[in-house]
Amino acid sequence: MSQTTASITTAQWQQKRDQFVSKGVSNGNRSLAVKGEGAELYDLDGRRFIDFAGAIGTLNVGHSHPKVVEAVKRQAEELIHPGFNVMMYPTYIELAEKLCGIAPGSHEKKAIFLNSGAEAVENAVKIARKYTKRQGVVSFTRGFHGRTNMTMSMTSKVKPYKFGFGPFAPEVYQAPFPYYYQKPAGMSDESYDDMVIQAFNDFFIASVAPETVACVVMEPVQGEGGFIIPSKRFVQHVASFCKEHGIVFVADEIQTGFARTGTYFAIEHFDVVPDLITVSKSLAAGLPLSGVIGRAEMLDAAAPGELGGTYAGSPLGCAAALAVLDIIEEEGLNERSEEIGKIIEDKAYEWKQEFPFIGDIRRLGAMAAIEIVKDPDTREPDKTKAAAIAAYANQNGLLLLTAGINGNIIRFLTPLVISDSLLNEGLSILEAGLRA
């Protein structure tokens, strides 16, 4: 902590924040973070917080992992930023090689690096359009892809992400996506799949012709949309449809990647090989880095100079990402993800017996969520209750986030390095919030 930071109180920092920082930037917790380690954060007043938010899925290897810190320190001492477009450097190339090696599929792959998740999605769209010579972009209802103009256009939730920011990019369409908890009463999952798949097919008759579509962009598990998990059958149908019609199938793995669901990429659970994968968040343990990985012929459709950016694929970010990949392997975080998810799931089902407002429990690996409803029969979303639970947690030492179109989903994005004892301590705080 710097001397300046220590000499100013939390209240004074909060006043400065309100005076000098745009109110358009939200803060889920008004404390001042000064130190993070593993799955714990400490504020300016010395209070400890157990982290179930993970910087919105950015910290799968935890806060300030020693190997990440050492890699970044070493890199900063040697080279901070020559600009890859000016002079290339080894870490960028090494990271591209490693990611191409772990990405699904035996085909030849290439990668590019950028700064943010939204940039990765934008560049996936650019690549798909260049490769197919088509314009149309299809995303899905309840999907979230970023806050730039193109990615806002692809995003489903109007407030707070899109309201008043138009006009939006043309030739962007949103296809139906399954939501099994909210399916029609009495309908089986199989029948519901039939219905949604038919609606997906009809979408390409009523809304946009497939031969005009460059890419379909899908989150294998919808993040901001509420941790909605599609069936293997639905995902495979979408991938097959894309292949049949020459459409680039893009897996948006920005929140789901790097062991969050128990595999490097969530799309692996669905036995589908995407054409392109977008990555960011936990890729570099909190440093700004994103990328697009995919079929070599697609990445090479762009001519030199058509992709990239001033800070894209910085040496510091690439060094951190290489350390992250080592940590995932050395510490078995894919396996640990499933263990964490099971602990959360088991506890959530205990709660469900006691609290009727817990409507649904769902997870893939450690990407877990509980849906808060007003009535288990009507399944009406209860945003107010979910917000109160999250507020209680944040006031009592647990960083916790909500999600979903209706804001009624409690989501778990804890670092995968969390111990069982710390995880259970955090769950105890959450349980107190459920009772409050």
UniProtKB/Swiss-Prot annotation:
UniProt keyword annotations, A-Z: Aminotransferase, Pyridoxal phosphate, Transferase
Protein name: Probable 4-aminobutyrate aminotransferase
GO BP terms, alphabetized: gamma-aminobutyric acid catabolic process
Record pathway: Amino-acid degradation; 4-aminobutanoate degradation
Reaction(s) the record says it catalyses: 4-aminobutanoate + 2-oxoglutarate = succinate semialdehyde + L-glutamate; (S)-3-amino-2-methylpropanoate + 2-oxoglutarate = 2-methyl-3-oxopropanoate + L-glutamate
GO cellular component: cytosol
Disulphide bridges, residue numbers: none
Record family assignment: Belongs to the class-III pyridoxal-phosphate-dependent aminotransferase family.
Sites of N6-(pyridoxal phosphate)lysine modification: 281
Source species: Bacillus subtilis (strain 168)
InterPro entries named in the record: 4NH2But_aminotransferase_bac, Aminotrans_3, Aminotrans_3_PPA_site, Class-III_PLP-dep_AT, PyrdxlP-dep_Trfase, PyrdxlP-dep_Trfase_major, PyrdxlP-dep_Trfase_small
Superkingdom of origin: Bacteria
Necessary cofactors: pyridoxal 5'-phosphate
Gene name linked to the record: gabT
GO molecular function: (S)-3-amino-2-methylpropionate transaminase activity; 4-aminobutyrate:2-oxoglutarate transaminase activity; pyridoxal phosphate binding
Entry's EC annotation: 2.6.1.19, 2.6.1.22
